[in-house]
Amino acid sequence: MKNNWMWCLVVLLSLGTIVPLQAQTGGTEKEVAALEQQWLQSQKTNNPDLVAPLIADKFIGTGADGKVTDRAQLLAAAKGSKYDSMEYEDVKVTAFGNTAIATGASRVKGTDETGKPMDTHVRWTDTWVKMANGKWQCVASHVSLIKS
């Protein structure tokens, strides 16, 4: 009988640690989704200062053209691009402890930093890490062209 009570106690204590973890995961996913929306606002308003704090110093991005960019290149491109419209679709965030993966698609119309017109549909994946200071930053991003 004593062993049964011990076993029940272990199970109940285990549930107590699982429930907060699930709540934290849901909060993490909402927090990272909000950061993705902040990134979108930055692009729509042509204001790279909104996204700069969200991009890690060692950021690595891969564009739909296969070019690899760093943080400085990403922010320079954001400053020079002009968007007539940009909307996110099918955004999903999955948390894995201090890492979160955000995926989605974007329809983009406007001009890029070189003045070339854009009218594209892309799928993207962003990798976010919760840094030592407790803030989330995007460490990697990959964009693929969706063919019509």
Where are these regions (language model features)?
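A beta-strand edge to alpha-helix "cap/lid" segment located at domain peripheries
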Residues: 22-148
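A detector of low-complexity, intrinsically disordered, Ser/Thr/Gly/Pro/Ala-rich segments
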Residues: 4, 15, 23-26
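Bacterial N-terminal signal peptides
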Residues: 8-20
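Bacterial N-terminal signal peptides that target proteins for export
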Residues: 1-9
